[in-house]
Amino acid sequence: MSAVDGGSKRGVSRRVFLGGAAWAAGCAVLWAANRMLGRIPAVRAQPEELTPQAYFPLAMKRYPQPKVVRVHAAAATSWDFQTGWYGEYVDQAVVKQMLERGLLELTGGGSMQGAWAMLLPGYSSGRKIAVKVNLNNCRSCDDSDNVIDALIEPVNALISSMVQAGVEAEDIWVYDASRRIPARFYERRENQQASYIDRFGCADQTATFNHVHPSLKVSFSHPQMVTDRWLTDLLYDASYVINMPILKRHGTNPVTLGFKNHFGSLDSLGGAGDDNPHPYINPQDDRYSVDFSPLVEINANRNIAQKTVLTVGDALFGASSVGATPAPWTSFDGSPNSLLLSRDPVAIDCVMCDLLRAEWGLDDAAYDYLMLAEQRGLGTFETGDPWGGGYNRLDYRYVEL
């Protein structure tokens, strides 16, 4: 199958995203310029000096053209969208092949050892790797509904590839610091040495917020957001961060992808009235502004920005809204059956936005936080057509298994 086919049978009924690649490549530049017109670059705080305990592998990162890889395998899932829990219909062996193939394509390495040597520069035994999963819809340790949440299979595949490359499993922390890790996720883990950490004690450990270092404090530039939030302590103790969002839309922010996944790294999202971050990510709220995004300010924290070595987007099923049950996609003729990988957190969110927009449509405001993120130096922004050649700044690659 060619890259243009994009992992599905594109019939007459298929939507042609934004009028095709040529339109996307030309008009996206004009559209983005109009959205950004009149913006004032955010004021950046002076970086703090940290102790040697906090190792920043990306402090001197210099990447060539940002690369985003999408790996598709029709055999990855087999759910009929009716019977039982969708998580029972995922082929672990296929997902491992997808993840490993994606890592090789992303890094150009000839083996898992070579790929992870690039992704984990300076790794040695004892340096921790924090893996952020999205279990936002899990409300109990024995959660059993069919609402979209993280699946264990991509996590198992990720850990397996790292261990294969020589990483100590004990150095891997899988976490959601604001939610529960349910039994149906935790009990299906393949590696017993990696640690699983949540907010409510459903797994191995409970995430702590002891403010172990001032660099974990997240202060917002908006004058109405006066309450400081704190990142979980493990992000200071970790040397590397891997982000594993789910491909889905949202009801408040138009999308919930990699940047929003780190809401689950904070001690609290609460706050009365204007001190709550949610109005500022909702384009329908009067308090929303294209010049401010709490998502960007959270992800700009150096414990995230300077430690994130990889984002793996779980698009095995995806969802049309934050609390939806997976449903067939028109643009994939069923489940997306895909994993996306990138070293650039902005670029991969752009491509995932484009996939969501092609299927369900998105307001232009869905991309605002990504334009701000590029201004903050967090990555590369571009909209385009993931079904064809609609990217100029991004090196978008499609792999079919």
Kindly label every feature range from the protein language model.
Residues 19:
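Phosphate-coordinating loops and pocket residues in cytosolic domains that bind phosphorylated ligands
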Residues 27-30, 349:
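Alpha-helix initiation and N-capping motif
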Residues 1-12, 23-27, 35-42:
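N-terminal secretory signal peptides
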Residues 31-73:
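C-terminal segment of N-terminal export signals and the immediately downstream linker at the start
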Residues 60-125, 136-145, 149-157, 164-401:
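Extended, low-polarity segments enriched in aliphatic/aromatic residues
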